[in-house]
Each structure stands twice: as structure tokens, then as C-alpha cells.
């Protein structure tokens, strides 16, 4: 495989993902936002190097004309983290938690905090839609047993049911707040925090 820098891999990976999910490549601005580059000229420089290496082809007269030339180029395994997918958690009415690993899902290492235990859960329901978490999405969760007010968590209720909600510790109770104005919060005396949601993965059908 052609040797690429981590930034070039990130850019190539993002372009491939956008083409696969949307059917067309991202703009230079979108690439910059995705990989943390504020300067469009820096993005252009990386694209030029990818083009020189024969991995992409660009049409300078069009803003989104980026074609992947080598579809076999992929992320080296050393830059992939296999994250366990653990059952399903509701984002509507709680369902009984299933804590078994169903499969492992490869994620780019930049999406996974170093030295942290991370897992993924499939969402069922639409109570978190205003937070950008939709039915059938996968949430990426950093395993931890505490949370700050306002954080989105995976919480285990007193009935050993798991749910994804925004966490608030109030004077006499815990409030698990949905991000959907049509739904009521869950009020409990005690909950166990399984982890904090740090990302969302979505496939476009």
C-alpha cells in the first residue's frame, strides 16, 4: 500500500465514507471540518499529495469532484479499534438490557479515546432525536459509572433496564431526560451509569 500520513488516511477515509453514504464526495470545507483542519489551503495540499500518489483524481473546475481511484486502499489494521457491540438499548421506553457482545465493529482509532473502555449499542426509538440520535443508530459509549448533569448516558434503572437519556441529578431524585418534546422524563431514586455517549454511528439506507 502507498505510505500515507495519518492525516492523509483520515482524509481518504472520510471521502470514501461520504461517497458511500451520500453518493457524492465532500467539499473541501467539509473535509477540513471532519479532520480538524481550519485552512482550506492545507486541505488542498493534502488532496494534491493524494492525487500525486494516484489515490484520487480531482476536477479543479468543480467543488466536489473528487474520485477515489484505488478502492482497495483501506485503513491499516493498526489504526482500527474493534469495538464490542453490546445488545440493544432503547431511546424510547426502556427495554430489558442485554449485556452480551453480539459482534465487534471496527472504528478508526481517532474516534476512540486512548486507554478507555468503549462499547457500542444500537438505539431503538426516537426519544433522543433532538440530540441527533435516531432510531437504529449506534451510539459509541465510553464506559464509566459517573456522569455530569446534561451529559447523555446509558443508564441502568432500578428494574435492570437500560436506556439512553440526558442525565440530571436533582435534589431528591435522578431525572433521565429525553430529547423529544413529546416524551416525558423518567424520574428515579437510583440509577446505575453504564457509560457516557461520546459519538453516534449511522448507516444511510
UniProtKB/Swiss-Prot annotation:
Induction: By mitomycin, requires an intact dinR gene. An SOS-independent induction of dinR occurs during competence, does not require an intact dinR gene. Pfam families: LexA_DNA_bind, Peptidase_S24. GO terms for molecular function: DNA-binding transcription repressor activity; sequence-specific DNA binding; serine-type endopeptidase activity. Residues 28-48 bind DNA. Disulfide bonds: none annotated. GO terms for biological process: DNA repair; DNA replication; negative regulation of DNA-templated transcription; proteolysis; SOS response. Signal peptide: none annotated. Its EC number is 3.4.21.88. Disruption phenotype: 100-fold decrease in homologous recombination efficiency. The active site is at residues 127, 165. It is an enzyme of class 3 (hydrolase). It comes from the Bacteria. Following treatment with mitomycin C protein levels begin to decrease after a 5-min lag and do not return to their original levels for at least 90 minutes. GO terms for cellular component: protein-DNA complex. SUPFAM superfamilies: LexA/Signal peptidase, Winged helix' DNA-binding domain. Belongs to the peptidase S24 family. Homodimer. Represses dinA, dinB, dinC, recA genes and itself by binding to the 14 bp palindromic sequence 5'-CGAACNNNNGTTCG-3'; some genes have a tandem consensus sequence and their binding is cooperative. In the presence of single-stranded DNA, RecA interacts with LexA causing an autocatalytic cleavage which disrupts the DNA-binding part of LexA, leading to derepression of the SOS regulon and eventually DNA repair; autocleavage is maximal at pH 11 in the absence of RecA and ssDNA. This is LexA repressor. It comes from Bacillus subtilis (strain 168). The gene is lexA.
